Amino acid sequence: MKNKIYLTTLFIFSLLINQYFANRGAFPIDSFLSFDAAFNIISGNHPFKDYWLITGPFVDYIQALFFLIFGINWMSYVLHASILNTLLCLFSFYYFLNIGLKNFYAFIYSLGVAILAYPSIGTPFIDHHSVIFCMLACFSVSLAILSKKNLFWILTPIFITFSFFSKQIPSPYFVVLFAFIISFYFFNNQNINKNILLNLFFGSLISFFLVIGVFLVNEIPLENFLVQYILYPISLGEERIDKLNIDFKNLISQFKYIYIISIPLIVSTFFLAKNKKKNLIKKNEFIVSLLFLGSVVILIYFQLLTKNQVLIFFLIPIAAACSHAYTIKYFNNKYLIYFIIAVFIFTTTKYHIRFNQNRKFIELVNADFSLAEDAIQLDGRLKGLKWITPHYIDRPLDEIHFLIDAKNILSKKSGRKIIVTDYQFFSSFLNNKFTSPNKWYDELSIPDRKNKYYDVHKNFFLSKIKKNKISYLFFIGKNKNEMYFFEEFFNENECIISNELSELLLEFDISKCIF
């Protein structure tokens, strides 16, 4: 009965906390990442085939499903992220119980996970999806070892596949970690279920057919996928690794609380490794702790590679729970338990205020939220969102008026058009089914002139304009038209006629051009 109360409370809390903080401001390029992309899929336009995409197709397809069920609106958009936050929270609770925590402590640490996982951004985001699915896979392997339930072996490759198609990394690193851990598990256990490999294969087969089904049904060219999702991002990854800045601040200082809270677990794992008389339970506990610590290392490396705001602080309550459980088993020191709980409460509060309340992840840490406006003024489908962005941080109402003007002008423009913007809701609001040839436009999504895939992207872009007989390019937002790709495009085609329609809206008439 008590477990049901805990589970119900966790379900409601993890869902509502994300729904609440997702409404607290927006950072257009991140907050609306999959809004129009999901609309494009519903309209019959698919990633890799109809628009250039270097990461995140799984997020787009799942969001399209949410839009089909709940309608194209802000609530259903945020609900997608909230449900994943809930899934991680409930999985964490079950995992904490299985590593030996009492119900109450498992409940408290799970609340911490719900607070620090998805609410930092609140809306569907590729980095959060990829990391959370990797953690779910980590939990699945651990639970498969501890509980001996075949379901978790089946779920592991499915979660890894979902992570990979949310973002390419860190899932490959987790595959290597899992291969090592599972091999070690086989080597150290004599009486092992021989169906483990069969269950892993079955989960992999389910994942394979899901992916192949999407590709075949939607006629997505394999070559496009390989170039956009594998080969071109690899070229970017090589550059990022070369430029990786590993100094004290990046590697130690910003993750210090993850390290501190993990110390009891690390010490316990060390003693378990030195104990040559381990029984089966202790062997499994050693493997599970090693798996989690390996996951922490991978996610810290991933965070350094992404060079984004830190999103892995939800590891703190998980590490606290693991340290708590292993301290009880191998130290039984109440003062150490008090220390773990104190660090957990302090850090959860600290990062909740920084990332949820002050919205640091979406660059609103200096915002005065009393200035935020109801986004319903812009469109009824944004009901619930309190509009304030970093672009007009002191003038959110002005930004809304500029966007309303752009929306009204575009709604009256006849002719086939594509919209280039970070405000990725205009296509869905205007029911414009001619998708932009790129999901979004930034320095990474579009290959640099020096990149060997520059011409591949350029030809892809031009082919979509030609195929869809596009007459107009509209740019909403500042400086998008000044990107090197568009500067070259405009310089090479003197037939293009430009027109500034408002502060945020530029029109480029390409109807007289032949591509």
Tell where the protein language model's regions lie, with residue ranges.
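Membrane-interface alpha helices of multi-pass inner-membrane proteins
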Residues: 152-170, 174-179, 293-304
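Short acidic/glycine- and proline-prone juxtamembrane loop motifs at membrane-interface regions
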Residues: 122-130
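Extracytoplasmic
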Residues: 169-170, 219, 345-514
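Extracytoplasmic catalytic/substrate-binding loops of multi-pass membrane glycan-assembly enzymes
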Residues: 22-37, 47-63, 72-75, 218-222
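Perimembrane helix-loop-helix junctions
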Residues: 173-206, 327-329
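Transmembrane-helix motifs of polytopic, lipid-linked glycan transferases
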Residues: 79-103, 136
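Membrane-interface transmembrane helices that cradle and orient dolichyl/undecaprenyl
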Residues: 98-100, 135-155, 163, 187-190, ...
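Transmembrane-helix signature of polytopic, membrane-embedded enzymes
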Residues: 92-115, 150
